[in-house]
Amino acid sequence: MTKPGVDQRGRAKEYIGLLHQEYDLYPHRTVLDNLTDAIGLEFPKELAMRKAIVTLKMAGFPEEKSKEILDRMPAQLSEGERHRVALAQVLIREPKIVILDEPTGTMDPITKIDVKHSIMHSRDDIDETFIVVSHDMEFVRDICDRLALMRGGKIVEIGKTADVLAHLTEDERKVMSQPPA
């Protein structure tokens, strides 16, 4: 990763999992397919089912619910369940670093709490690094143990979450406390 040039591209890709704010599940594929075949993972069916169940549990589903939803289509799931399946889609690849881009986006408060718990559960379960990109300071306060504050596209402070949040300007607090548009 330290060597420049086009032939060195993609070397870190296998170590990083990324969940975009506007994640997408394949609407005409089952949850099991969304966690395996649809993202290029080829497992024998029994192994695929086992790995999917374990990964869904990491994303916050109870074991019985994990088994129950494998044959469902994304439209048959709630918004929070779809988000957890999308998180599982990232986790099933066993990344060393998980990047979550605005994981709560425009969610309602109940779904946001559900997603917060699933992220915390998976973070504790796999014990890997999670990087959360968010303007939702309440969410950041609840989920992050360290924080990097950016202004104008540059990191200006890194430290314990409470310490960094204490240095927000009044204007930043106002902007970050507003619900997403």
Model-derived regions: residue spans:
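Conserved ABC ATPase signature
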Residues: 73-77
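Catalytic Walker B motif of ABC-type/P-loop ATPase nucleotide-binding domains
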Residues: 98-101
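ABC ATPase NBD coupling module
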Residues: 1-17, 41, 167-168
